[in-house]
Amino acid sequence: MRVTTRIAGFAREQREGIRFCALFALFTAVAFAVLYAGQNVVVVPLNRHLAWMTEQVLRLVGVHASSAGGVVSLGGFAVEIRNNCNAIYEVGLYTAAVWAYPASWRERLAGTVVGAGVLYAVNFLRILTLLTLGLLHRSWFEAAHLYAWQAVFLLVVGTCWIAWVSRIRPVA
């Protein structure tokens, strides 16, 4: 059997998976290109808004905090909310996976809205816990920020997508 015949047979057998991967790659590239191009219009204002929201929540629970631009200060400890701190790229990745999967546009829209909400809520919790950790145990901040929360957040993204797929395509 010739190699090209085997490849063609494999492609026919795996058509849906190949289609998903191709669409996922395309949608991911488009999402990241749009976010990169809209840096000053979307990303920077989102960072400022997250800093302000963080300040407001901390003040509600009686913690003296302040924010300026994308920086949140809390009792001598400050962090700057930057591109990878705002969940927008993770939401872009999740959205690309949802829209690449074969489902109705209503299922995709609902999955996008609910999933994005979950991811932004988890990210907000991430920001609050990292601020608290930085204030109480500054030496642990870098490891928690760069390793622990990055891994946890990617697991949350994957879990959200798997939960959505399981909801629209229950396993028999």
Regions found by a protein language model. Name each.
Residues M1-A172:
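Hydrophobic N-terminal alpha-helices or hydrophobic patches in metabolic proteins across all domains
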